[in-house]
UniProtKB/Swiss-Prot annotation:
A Pfam family hit: La
Residue list for modification Phosphothreonine: T520, T735
Biased composition (Polar residues): 31-41, 142-153, 452-470, 628-642, 732-741
Assembly notes: Interacts with PABPC1. Interacts with RACK1. Associates with polysomes via the 40S ribosomal subunit.
Biased composition (Basic and acidic residues): 607-622, 683-700
Modified residues (Phosphoserine): S246, S426, S436, S453, S490, S500, S526, S558, S570, S603, S667, S721, S730, S739
Encoding gene, per UniProt annotation: Larp4b
Cellular localisation: Cytoplasm, Cytosol
GO MF annotation list: RNA binding
Protein name (database record): La-related protein 4B
Region (Disordered): 1-45, 86-160, 398-436, 451-542, 567-586, 599-741
Domain of life where this protein originates: Eukaryota
Gene Ontology BP terms: positive regulation of translation
Domain HTH La-type RNA-binding: 152-241
Length: 741
């Protein structure tokens, strides 16, 4: 009966408090449910009267041990005052507990509990009710009492906390950094109270605007307007400023201004700066009284009107300082750190190859307009060599052939000196470009009038390159690009791979042709037209020829751009063609006379040429707009043919390359190009001459060609020959003709 009643009694308060306790009361026995209820109440109350629960069931011998724990940690005397029970039962419990304390035996307590079981059955029921209610009801009672006790504290604490918080928010120290409150101020430094009440840390304390206004009015450092809508920091206006009073003024005279009977006493009078004097008073009212006295009664000082004003303690607004303590400091540190990473970190942390790369790339995040080679970005880095090393393998090899190719059009337009200056630095950079001049062969042939085949030009290239290597270094230094040759040789070789096979063929042909030409060098070339006109006296029967040569030079300059270049070509042509005629007409001493005899005199060798020359003259007269003497028309026809050949430059160069395999076929192809400016063999009549005449001319032509192609080779292909070498060779060719004359 008691266990069932105990289960019911324990289940009722648990159903009110915790649903889980009800389930446990149905599932468990009475003493177990009682123990659960006791254990729940133990940490909160440490109640001693719960020892009575062990006496409810005679089988509950185990709970005597827990009584000892309760006694050890119990405060029985203090808790008894809060119980709502009959006074007899707690005293019994206390006596039993004291008995336990005195004896220290749980068996005695259980015997004492078993003796009055029949008498105390009803009392135990009531006591269990009281105990259960004492287990659960005192908790809300204590909570209520604690809440009732803490509520006045909480009402006082939030008020004090709110007072301190508002005082801090409107203090001058905070307003110096709180940009939000400063932005909400009007001209009189008033801030709406609603703005202050909406601050987060004030909302947490209170949302009652009336309470906030009341607290603000109680603050001594804050001034609230009459309506209670605005608040501002207290204007500490205790200093009167006197302006435009010199520093040399005695302090006694300034103090005498404020020694009237009705004036309050000032605390301090001192010269501040810039002819300003500060007079400090105790309160703002004293300062106001002194200010009115000066403005209304004194008015003048040292014969000048007094300029006085009250100095309010200004709020030191630092826009660059933090708003709320640490945050803007962190922001400033962050901005400085980000600024430092782009400029100072690369020299500090990096070797020369890692961080400059990143710093070249990272500035694009904060300045997108800069390229990575912009000088202001490059200068902070100590390793400019790395930057050159970074760009040279990717860009410089590509730009160096491009720059050399860009120089081709001016070469084709300008005189020969410009070829010497522009061509050499582009090709003499590295051994790769020197070893592969085929990169530029075809472009040079097409751009420079197709005067000389690439076969003969390459022979001159190798010779002149070997002759004057020091000029290349000077020219390279002049260009300002001193770079490793390996970086540029590789792209040069890479570009020359397309023509490398043809270039090998050309070199083989070049060496074979030079070997065939080299054994017969003894015949010296004859002088040029310029030497004949300027240096030699007129020979017998050559006066008319000189005039025709002058006329030919004028028409040559009018037709072809760059007359000086063509005159150089004409000198080379004369050196080639005159020795051809030399062995057949030994009686003619001068080249001019030879040319006259070749064109006009009925020599037995040239008789078969005359009708062909006449036919060619008829054709050219129909084409030419300036008909003149047969000599001039023949020379003009040469220029017309030369112009036609210039229009067909690419195909003609290809023809030269195809036919250059035969020295016999290449030698007749060369004289037409050489004889464009010359009057000896006009135009392409050399091609139309009979084969015996051509074969008769071949050995002297081969004798003269080894030197001649080198001159004309340098004019189109100046990239391989320095200027000094070209000048020396031209002098060597022009000087020997003086000996036979």
């Amino acid at each position: 009966m008691t266990s069932d009643q105990d289960a019911k009694v324990v289940a009722e308060p648990q159903a009110q408090r915790v649903q889980e306790g009800k389930d446990s009361s149905h599932l468990m026995n009475g003493p177990i449910s009682q123990t659960t209820s006791q254990t729940r109440s133990l940490p909160a109350l440490t109640q001693v009267p719960t020892t009575k629960v062990s006496e409810l069931n005679p089988n509950a011998k185990v709970w005597g041990t827990h009584m000892l724990h309760l006694e050890a940690s119990s405060a029985a005397v203090g808790v008894n005052a809060a119980w709502e029970e009959a006074p007899g039962h707690p005293t019994d419990c206390d006596q039993q507990v004291l008995g336990l304390d005195a004896n220290g035996d749980g068996d005695k307590s259980r015997e004492n509990a078993a003796l009055p079981d029949a008498q105390e059955a009803e009392q135990t029921d009531m006591s269990t009710l009281a105990l259960d209610h004492s287990e659960y009801e005192p908790l809300p009672e204590n909570n209520d009492t604690g809440g009732n006790e803490s509520q006045p504290e909480s009402q006082e604490d939030p008020r004090e906390v709110l007072k301190k918080t508002l005082e801090f928010c409107l203090s001058r120290e905070n307003l110096a950094s709180d940009m939000y409150l400063i932005s909400q101020m009007d001209s009189d430094q008033y801030v709406p109270i609603t703005t202050v009440a909406n601050l987060d840390h004030i909302k947490k304390l209170s949302t009652d605007v009336d309470l906030i206004v009341e607290v603000l009015r109680s603050l001594p450092l804050v001034q609230v307007d009459e309506k209670g809508e605005k608040v501002r920091p207290n204007q500490n206006r205790c200093i009167v400023i006197l302006r435009e009073i010199s520093e040399s003024t005695p302090v006694e005279e300034v103090e005498a201004l404020f020694k009237g009977d009705n004036l309050p006493k000032f605390i301090n009078c001192e010269f501040a700066y810039n002819d300003n004097w500060f007079i400090t008073f105790e309160t703002e009212a004293d300062a106001q009284q002194a200010y009115k006295y000066l403005r209304e009664e004194v008015r003048t000082f040292q014969g000048k009107p007094i300029k006085a004003r009250i100095k309010a303690k200004a709020i030191a607004i630092n826009t660059f300082l933090p708003k709320n303590g640490f945050r803007p400091l962190d922001m400033n540190l962050y901005t400085q750190q980000r600024y430092a990473t782009s400029f100072y970190l690369p020299p500090v942390y990096s070797p020369q190859q890692q961080f400059p790369l990143y710093s070249l790339i990272t500035p694009q995040t904060w300045s997108t307009t800069h390229s990575y080679l912009d000088p202001p970005l490059v200068t902070p880095f100590p390793s400019t060599g790395f930057i050159n090393g970074f760009t040279s393998p990717t860009f410089k090899p590509a730009t160096s052939p491009l720059t050399s190719l860009r120089q081709y059009p001016p070469r084709s337009r300008n005189p020969s000196k410009s070829h010497l200056r522009h061509a050499i630095p582009s090709t003499e950079r590295g051994p790769g470009l020197l070893e592969s001049p085929s990169i530029f062969n075809f472009t040079a042939d097409r751009l420079i009038n197709g005067v000389r085949s690439p076969q003969t030009r390459q022979a001159g290239q190798t010779r002149t390159r070997i002759q004057n290597p020091s000029a290349y270094a000077k020219r390279e230094i002049g260009t300002g690009r001193v770079e490793p040759s390996s970086l540029e040789s590789s792209p040069g070789l890479g570009r020359g791979r397309k023509n490398s096979f043809g270039y090998r063929k050309k070199r083989e042909e070049k060496f074979t042709s030079s070997q065939t030409q080299s054994p017969t060098p003894p015949k010296p070339p004859s002088p040029s037209f310029e030497l004949g006109l300027s240096n030699f006296p007129p020979l017998p029967g050559a006066a008319g020829n000189l005039k025709t040569e002058d006329l030919f030079e004028n028409r040559l300059s009018s037709l072809i751009i760059g007359s000086s270049k063509e005159r150089n070509l004409s000198t080379d042509a004369s050196t080639n063609t005159v020795p051809v005629v030399g062995p057949r007409e030994p009686s003619v001493p001068a080249p001019c006379a030879v040319s006259a005899a070749f064109e006009r005199s009925p020599s037995p060798v040239h008789l078969p040429e005359d009708p062909k020359v006449a036919e060619k003259q008829r054709e050219t007269q129909s084409v030419d707009r300036l008909p003149s003497t047969p000599t001039t028309t023949a020379c003009k026809s040469v220029q017309v043919n030369g112009a036609a050949t210039e229009l067909r430059k690419p195909s003609y160069a290809e023809i030269c390359q195809r036919t250059s395999k035969d020295p016999s076929s290449s030698s007749p192809l060369q004289p037409p190009k050489e004889q464009k400016p010359s009057t000896v063999a006009c135009g392409k009549e050399e091609k139309q001459l009979s084969e015996p005449v051509e074969r008769h001319r071949e050995p002297p032509a081969l004798k003269s060609t080894p030197g001649v192609p080198k001159d004309q080779r340098r004019q189109p292909g100046r990239r391989a020959s320095p200027p000094a070498a070209g000048k020396r060779l031209s002098k060597e060719q022009n000087t020997p003709p003086k000996s036979p004359q």
